[in-house]
Design a protein with these regions (language model features):
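N-terminal amphipathic/hydrophobic targeting modules at extreme N-termini
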Residues: 20, 31-32, 48-51, 56
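N-terminal Rossmann-like NAD(P)+-binding domain of SDR-like oxidoreductases, especially those catalyzing
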Residues: 65-252, 379, 388-391
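Short Gly/Ser/Thr- and charged-rich N-terminal loops/segments
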Residues: 4-6, 20, 40-41, 54
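C-terminal substrate-binding subdomain of Rossmann-fold SDR/epimerase-dehydratase oxidoreductases
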Residues: 253, 274-397
């Protein structure tokens, strides 16, 4: 079963009065023999190429290195689309993982493959809860802050929630990280931002030092980009004033299995419609341009950024730089899924409301992230569509 409801019932979730702290997972069981094996395997592979050395394990060194390997990663919004993939990836690597999520747009089912994992703690709660944030940061060696109000349809409908959800919890987390740093404990943090911060900048390709060009405040869709820009300003201010190790990533259309189309995401909407033989609804004339990157590529970049000290204190575009128009995307989805669906066009005012303004072209310059961590996306559009279609097909009875 996939996550995602229609936009209107979200209000119920947003208005939950007091968030519950509901921890699941067995949490603290460490698999020491696994770690020892991993460490000694690492030793065997080290040294000059082709030279195999027999090493006598040094118990002190092993326990020290095992302590280094036992990282506890906190993922806010870890039951969401990107967060759940990140949680799986970190568990596979041997991290302890704490997921905190209020299940507003994410859902527990996204974690079904790892819910019983002994190194996962799942906490149902909101990161606007001061005590909860303090407790979770106190247990973490690094933080991936992904929780936010996400999705064009949701943002157009719920602008108050967008602004509150995206600004206040980020400030709370940064403030707490600042206090911890003052007491001598620096915890690296990745902050998820978005290509929406560029607004409607008319450049063909956007690079990190470009201007942010937003529309009028009477148009609620800009509240998402502006709220994320405030997060970036805050993060960079904490870097400057308090020396916190924070890195900001601006995601450009991340897609893959488990993404829900319920909040306006285009690829899951198209794939679902194509597989069901329904029309694919393209907004406006379909000539607006986007770049789609697979979540597996994005996760690699996020982890590498937080683990690269030289990347700290900077903002990075993260995504694919291969442009495709939404109309061509719809055609490609129909072709890859062998669908007989038709394409229908819908105006923005019918899809959202009269005030809606879109961005015609959104293509990142990836030079900075390539220079910092050697990042290049590995999956092309066909691979990506197939991966999403396979997920839907496998869920159809
Ligand atoms: N998917 C994309 O293409 C994309 C593009 C740009 C930016 N981003 C950013 O990446 C991050 C993850 O996005 P996603 O696509 O996985 O969306 P998502 O909606 O699947 O994930 C967000 C998660 O945050 C949770 N959440 C929201 N408010 C919370 C709160 N106060 N406390 C606890 N949990 C809360 C939601 O329940 C959800 O599980 C977001 O910050 C988003 O702005 C995503």
């Amino acid at each position: 079963m996939r996550c995602g409801r229609q936009v209107s019932p979200l209000r119920d979730h947003f208005q939950k009065s007091s968030p519950s702290l509901n921890g699941r997972g067995n949490g603290r069981i460490l698999k020491l023999p696994d770690l020892t094996k991993r460490f000694t395997a690492g030793l065997r592979n080290s040294g000059s190429p082709g030279v195999r050395r027999r090493l006598r394990p040094d118990p002190f060194r092993i326990s020290h290195l095992m302590a280094c390997l036992m990282t506890t990663s906190l993922i806010t919004g870890g039951s969401g689309f990107i967060g759940s993939h990140l949680a799986e990836h970190l568990l596979r690597r041997g991290d302890d993982v704490i997921v905190v999520d209020d299940l507003s747009t994410g859902c527990q089912n996204n974690l079904s493959g790892i819910m019983e994992h002994p190194r996962l703690d799942f906490i149902e709660g909101s990161i606007d809860d001061v005590a909860l944030v303090a407790e979770l940061l106190g247990r973490s060696d690094r933080v991936f802050h992904l929780a936010a109000a996400v999705g064009v349809a949701l943002i157009a409908k719920e602008p108050i929630q967008t602004i509150e959800r995206n600004v206040y919890p980020t400030q709370l987390i940064l403030d707490r990280l600042g206090s911890m740093a003052q007491r001598g404990r620096q915890v690296p943090c990745f902050i998820a931002s978005t290509s929406e911060v560029y607004g409607k900048n008319p450049k063909d390709t956007w690079s990190e030092e470009d201007d942010l060009v937003f529309g009028a405040t009477t148009r609620p869709r800009w509240s998402y980009g502006v709220s994320k820009a405030i997060d970036e300003f805050l993060a960079l201010a904490y870097v400057k004033q308090q020396g916190l190790p924070i890195v900001v990533g601006r995601f450009f259309n991340v897609v893959g299995p488990r993404q829900t189309g319920a909040y306006g995401m285009v690829l899951p909407r198209f794939v679902e419609a194509a597989l069901a033989g329904r029309p694919l609804v393209v907004h406006d004339d379909g000539h607006q341009v986007r770049c789609f990157a697979h979540v597996d590529d994005i996760i690699q970049a996020v982890v590498k950024l937080i683990e690269t000290p030289a990347a700290s204190g900077r903002v990075y575009n993260i995504g694919s730089d291969q442009p495709v128009s939404i109309l061509d995307l719809a055609k490609r989805v129909i072709e890859r899924t062998n669908s007989s669906s038709e394409i229908q066009f819908q105006s923005y005012s019918d899809a959202y409301d009269q005030s809606f303004e879109d961005i015609r072209r959104r293509v990142p310059d990836l030079q900075r992230i390539h220079d910092a961590i050697g990042f290049r996306p590995t999956m092309n559009l066909n691979d990506i569509i197939d991966s999403v279609a396979n997920q839907y097909a496998s869920e159809t009875p």
